């Protein structure tokens, strides 16, 4: 049986986020009230509600909305909409990618500290995980030379969390170019 480590940040949020006076921990978008949702069309929600009221409630597209996939594909160069996988949040997307790509005995390099599931889920799948540490003196960037030393013949995946969680550091495309080109 696969054992996944206790997800520390989620446990902490479950305990404290609803009782906090000020919540500065969120990394998600602000939620909408029904009033906000109905007023998205700028017409007091009348047209939007009329359109919504006529919609058949069903399970939806199993592989994601074709229209949504078309729009997402336009954001990238040379990406076919058939290769877009729509998920409910990044957590689900991460789990799907890790379960699809990682096998026992694979080697994974994970930026650390980072989003816990990016190193604990590969471990739970039987992968050998090495941490690619970030450094305060380098503005919380990991070092490329450290990465080169971590790579093994069976390295299957390098996990980067961009923007980094917990530091918020954004790894620029320019910084990442040696990583993308070398590996």
Spans of model-derived segments:
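N-terminal small-domain helix-loop-helix segment of the aminotransferase-like
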Residues: 2-89
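Glycine-rich helix-loop-beta junction characteristic of Rossmann-like nucleotide cofactor-binding loops
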Residues: 75-78, 98-102
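Short acidic capping loops at alpha-helix termini that bridge into adjacent secondary structure
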Residues: 80-84, 104-107, 154
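Conserved PLP-anchoring active-site segment centered on the Schiff-base-forming lysine
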Residues: 100-122
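Short beta->alpha connector loops at strand-helix junctions that form conserved
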Residues: 112, 130-137
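Active-site phosphate-binding strand-loop segment of PLP-dependent enzymes
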Residues: 136-183
């Amino acid at each position: 049986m696969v054992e996944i480590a206790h997800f520390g940040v989620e446990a902490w949020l479950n305990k404290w986020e609803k009782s906090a006076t000020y919540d500065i921990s969120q990394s998600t978008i602000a939620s909408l009230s029904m009033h906000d949702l109905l007023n998205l069309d700028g017409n007091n929600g009348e047209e939007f509600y009329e359109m919504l009221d006529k919609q058949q409630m069903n399970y939806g597209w199993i592989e994601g909305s074709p229209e949504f996939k078309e729009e997402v594909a336009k954001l990238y160069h040379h990406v076919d909409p058939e290769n877009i996988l729509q998920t409910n949040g990044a957590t689900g997307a991460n789990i799907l990618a890790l379960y699809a790509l990682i096998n026992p005995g694979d080697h994974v390099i994970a930026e650390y500290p980072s989003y816990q599931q990016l190193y604990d889920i590969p471990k739970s799948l039987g992968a050998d995980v090495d941490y690619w540490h970030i450094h305060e003196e380098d503005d919380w960037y990991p070092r490329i030379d450290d990465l080169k030393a971590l790579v093994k013949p069976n390295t299957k995946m390098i996990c980067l969390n961009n923007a980094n969680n917990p530091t918020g550091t954004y790894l620029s495309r320019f910084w990442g170019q040696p990583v993308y080109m070398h590996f």
